């Protein structure tokens, strides 16, 4: 039986890193996202250059200005951050189908047994980090351990732009010397209370009798006691079912290359139909979204004659919608997205088209391989044109 391996991936200084990716002149400078310091606001994110001055998230902007007068203050662009977050999750889903997003900039991956695909889990983490840097222009840190809590703490030890793996069986010794403040779930008040009792490290917390800890912290005590030793059996939980499924990607360079756009559309269509089939559903509506170089965004949708869940039906419908938009506007394309909605259960068919049956069997085979080994473990002919992204 494989030893459990959980990966926690966190984008370094996410908001600021995105701003620096799209505005290279901000690189290596103290940058603060949150707005102008004259306002009554707080720091949403600070670059590592700004953090050297003691600036951190949640700090009043005016305080940050006093600490670092030369800092560059910017409003932030949450639509842009969401686009980057979607690209981030898309990359992660290529490595494992067991993905639990935690906000825009971090996620857990269940990677138990994936060594055979990548040589080692550490090499898998390196591949993920390289792809994020290459495709998004920002850095990520990764922690690997036998549980979610240990993996998250390992990520903090890896920052910035690094990775840290806790060997199986060494979780308790890894955590023991660390300050209790690093433990997720220990807030300022709990930290102060524990330290007033002389409990300042996770090792000391783990050594406390369960009865004593419960008398001080109540029902939360058993979790903290176990977590301090790296014991955390919580599963990686995928998001609950939504009423629509969509994928979109923002290109590094605006393009009108038809072959490239079709390949990207095919890739996105395969992603959403795989999710649809995993839910045992079919879709009645297909939608396409295109954003041009001037940020004009157009959407089109079509109601299908028959509900569908196959790659081919969804892609061909999306392709027709995409070409309709492109024929009406000659600008280069910045963003491409495809979505499906109005779900229903699979309908019983009195007559089965042999060709359609073969395609359904092919889709099922692809799904089975990808669910076990990750989405990028097998590629179709059209998406193979995008092999550089894998």
Curated annotation (Swiss-Prot):
Gene Ontology terms: biological process: DNA-templated DNA replication; error-prone translesion synthesis; SOS response
Catalytic activity as recorded in UniProt: DNA(n) + a 2'-deoxyribonucleoside 5'-triphosphate = DNA(n+1) + diphosphate
Keyword Metal-binding assigned: yes
Keywords in alphabetical order: Cytoplasm, DNA damage, DNA repair, DNA replication, DNA-binding, DNA-directed DNA polymerase, Magnesium, Metal-binding, Mutator protein, Nucleotidyltransferase, Transferase
Listed InterPro entries: DNA/RNA_pol_sf, DNA_pol_Y-fam_lit_finger_sf, DNA_pol_Y-fam_little_finger, DNA_polymerase-Y, DNApol_IV, PolY_HhH_motif, Rev_trsase/Diguanyl_cyclase, UmuC
Domain of life: Bacteria
Cofactors demanded by this protein: Mg(2+)
Protein name from the UniProt record: DNA polymerase IV
